[in-house]
Structure formats: structure tokens, C-alpha cells
Amino acid sequence: MASVSPLAKYKLVFLGDQSVGKTSIITRFMYDKFDTTYQATIGIDFLSKTMYLEDRTVRLQLWDTAGQERFRSLIPSYIRDSSVAVVVYDVANRLSFLNTSKWIEEVRNERAGDVIIVLVGNKTDLVEKRQVSIEEGDSKGREYGVMFIETSAKAGFNIKPLFRKIAAALPGMESYSNTKNEDMVDVNLKPTSNSSQGDQQGGACSC
């Protein structure tokens, strides 16, 4: 009887300013749904998802960080042992794009070059409100030597391709760049002891 290979686990930490859609990207990937009611992440939220690949299974541990300044002191400890840093900005909020430089630099200060960084321009559904072009996002990705992709959590655009791109870049995963959408299965939800959802705030958020 063949031995069972241990489940490879990879920690993904989501970073970026408040309201750029980090939680919405994770929710769309995990459950294929979008919540129009904005809820600010308080502290750190943790979810996990298993990806079944051709000859092995990996567990992605998704750490959703709060974008508010008062929680910034918590973030370095979560970056330190991460495999992937997903830096998100809102294409309709230029300041959030400019601030990605600080987030990327913070990751590199904590992890040097031993981490995969993905720059994500979210909310592409806000066509009329766009303030950051795809060319600018791609240029910044090239400038910092990181991967780049645009998404819309609201429309479900490029969410699974984002995670396939990440999976293909993981150590030993180079052969899985063509992982199929249907190979992704939801498995688990584990809130951390120091995380919770903030009070619901009125108004729709196209995150």
C-alpha cells in the first residue's frame, strides 16, 4: 500500500489599504459569492482551502489582514512565515495603488526575497471610476519584479486565475500552471481567536 504524502501547506497573506476588496476576493474564491454589505476586517481573519492537483493536494491558508492603520502593528508577524503575499489595491482609488509600494517594501523587509508577491488590481467592474490603468499596474509589477493581475471580486473576474497563478508559482508547483477551475474545492473555515467581523456599515461596496 502506497504511503500517504503529507499535505503541503502554504500561507498566503492578503495586504493592502482598507476597502480595496481583500476579504471579497477571498470570499469569492472560497464560496463563489459576493457580499454587497461592507464589513471591515478587525485584526486578522484566517480561512483555508484545499486545491486538488494532478498528483498531490495542497492546503492554502488564507490570512486576511485589516487595512486600517491601527492594526498595522499586527501584520509583520503574519508576513514573516508566509509563502505568498497578495498586495491588493482598488483600481478606482489611486492612493491605494500608490500605497502598494509601501506594502511590497514591508513584505521584503520582513521576508527579503524568500516570498512570492502578487500585485492585484481589484474592482475592475468600476469602469467609469477607474483611476489606475492596467498598464500602470503592469508597469509597477515589472518595476518591483512581482506578478500582476487585475480582478473583480464583484463580477468574479480573474479570481480563480489569480489563485492558479499563485499555485503555479509555489515551490515545486511549476508543472501546475494549467490547473483547472473545477479542481478547487472548499474545505474549511477557522476564525482565529483574535479576529472577528466589524459592525456592518451601510451602503454597498463594490469590493
Swiss-Prot record:
Main location: Golgi
Record's keyword annotation contains GTP-binding: yes
Membrane topology designation: Lipid-anchor
GO MF annotations, alphabetized: GTP binding; GTPase activity
Entry keyword Plastid: no
Lipidation (S-geranylgeranyl cysteine): 205, 207
SMART domains: RAB, RAN, RAS, RHO
Any coiled-coil regions, as ranges: none
Record-annotated disulphide pairs: none
Gene Ontology terms describing biological process: protein transport; vesicle-mediated transport
PROSITE patterns: RAB
NCBIfam families: small_GTP
Similarity comment: Belongs to the small GTPase superfamily. Rab family.
Name recorded for this polypeptide: Ras-related protein RABH1d
